[in-house]
Amino acid sequence: MIIKKWSIYRASLDPVIGSEQGKSRPVLVISENAINDVLNIVNVIPITSRKEGRKIYPNEVEIPAHNYGLSNESIVLCQQIRTLDKTRLSHLYGTIDLKVKQSEIIEALCFQLGIDFEA
């Protein structure tokens, strides 16, 4: 399976402990293509549906409904970075190809990790 950075897949995240995101849900691949091509693991960020009135934090990025193959308004949870075996990935929803949205995600990741970086 060829996995590309910025692609959104469905992934099985269970088993989990405590507040970790679980179940089968969309995830955003953030690891570099050169690494994805040679390793059996990928770095991902879980995505969750946005509930009405839910606040968006600086380490999160909103994705409007009906974008990138997702039917609901969603949130990329940069505080929940995970490493997964590629076999956990199934359905490809789409790809975040908009540079502005990629930059928002990089900025949220840097905020989460305490990295001073201008995307």
Annotate each PLM feature:
Residues 1, 66-119:
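C-terminal terminal-subdomain/extension
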Residues 19-24, 29-65:
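Compact nucleic-acid interaction/catalytic patches
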